[in-house]
Amino acid sequence: MVQVEEYERFVGAETVQRVKEKARALRGLRVAHVNSTYYGGGVAEMLAPLTLLMNSLGIKTEWRVIQGSPDFFSITKKMHNALQGGDINLSELKREIYERVVYDNSIRNDLDHDRIVVHDPQPLPLINHCEKKGPWVWRCHVDLTSPNSEMWSYLSSFVEKYDAVIVTLEEYAQQLQTPQVFFMPAIDPFSIKNRELTESERQSRLDYYGIPTDLPLVTQVSRFDSWKDPEGVIRAFKLAREEVD
């Protein structure tokens, strides 16, 4: 398990010491992170090392995952997209399926922790069904710049019951009674995805795809859909070409 001291070469000793001091005030607390999957996607990738790191700092941290039917995950995928401005037909049946699955998960999960952090919209209504022993925080990982109004009107009724909301940027803040804080995500430099490649590994990949190395090289890695802004990547490439030929 990676210890916090091993991050010094990336963030500096002062930052690591500050993390230790902040963690000391939380030592002994029971914390639970709740999301919808153990693998796939950025949230799961973030929670895996974060849970281990928090435990190594003396914060008793668990990671709970809700379960659901294919219909549930189809609905929450559309909700996820609607929070980013996409269209959605939020029928009464869809709401019933969504809320029923979350209720069923509240029965299966004993969330009596001192702190609960719920990630993204999938587990959001859990707060309606669990006895609060301490603060609940909703961590929204999506772009809330211009959410679908119908979607936000529905979900905000749950959000308002939380003690705090964490969003990535100030531009994502919404009109809420609940306090909002802004916290940018980070990568784990020790994950397989982010590890440094050897020179032979790099050259092998470049040769395989026929990528020349006589010019500066920048990569953008994401799935190919509108929410990852592939058109923006092309525009960025054109701007870069104006500077580097």
Model region roles, listed by residue range:
Residues 1-245:
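Catalytic cores of nucleotide-sugar-dependent glycosyltransferases that transfer UDP/GDP/TDP-activated
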